[in-house]
Amino acid sequence: MKKEIIIVTISLGNDGAERILTELARQWVHDGHHITVIQTSPNRYGNEYALEKGIEQIEIHTTSSNKVIRFMQEIKELIKILKTRPNATCLSFLSASSFILAISSWFIKNRIVFSERNNPRKVPIGWHQQALRNFAFRFADTLVFQTEDARSYFPKSVQNRGVIIPNPINGKLPPPIEGEREKTIVTACRLHPQKNLPMMINAFSMLADEFPAYKLVIYGQGVLEDELRAQIKSLNLENRILLPGFASNILEKVAPCSMFVSSSDFEGISNSMLEALGMGLPVVVTDCPVGGARMVIKSGENGILVPVGDTQAMYEA
């Protein structure tokens, strides 16, 4: 049966949640459903991910520089849109958009689904942001969690409305490379403290002399770019550790590499890890909360799990 699904997000910026929602929207529209993506703050957070043809896009543009007034404008506009589509199921992946949708739910009749995409103990940052997230979850008809560990953080009233659904994987992955791979160790993520990229860089520096033909390529953008470049320069590895930025064709970039690595201190389920596994790359990742990596990797069989924060273990792996 054809369904109407509305995905509410602050933007289509270059983060994992936005990437998943674009993949889901693409699949659902192929399945014959009517899909609408509403961006509440497109101007402030960017549009790195393009939506497939056939997906309706609505952008809410606000004019005030005052955060409170802007927030109220976003809610007002969202309510106006949703009142014209009372039979649609509304889905939100991010805490900010979930809070906007939760307030809007007081005035609409739509079914509401929220999805927790990270470690709820760590994200969002700050007790007040977490309180807003927890408040928003009270108004969801259904909540989606990636792992049981993530669901267990919340009170029983939330857990009882929750389901565990791991991340989907792109159905159009490049096939595994046959023959010799490029001598490149690769990762793709936000340049953010959560990802603990300094540990990855230090681990690579420990093996750089042993394997002079190899390089480390870190795709992504973020607040730590200058700090990471300074670290790389201090290690005299500017020609061996590269930060090329965001890549819209990331699958083609990763497919020929020799190894995928993730050093996150915490994570939901890494999209880039799943895609690397699907393309046949050897994978070395930290066994971090909320348990997404250990759901799909049996260490020593289809990848290697290393302790969080253990540079030596990552080097040895």
Spans of features found by a protein language model:
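Aromatic "clamp/platform" in nucleotide-sugar-dependent glycosyltransferases that forms part
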Residues: 246, 265
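A conserved mid-protein helix/loop that constitutes part of the nucleotide-sugar donor-binding site
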Residues: 15-23, 183, 190-212, 218, ...
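Short His-centered aromatic/hydrophobic patch
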Residues: 92-98, 116
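Conserved acidic donor-binding segment of nucleotide-sugar-dependent glycosyltransferases
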Residues: 298-300, 304-311
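Donor nucleotide-sugar binding/catalytic pocket of nucleotide-sugar-dependent glycosyltransferases
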Residues: 56, 138-174
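Short hydrophobic beta-strand element within catalytic cores of glycosyltransferases
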Residues: 282-287
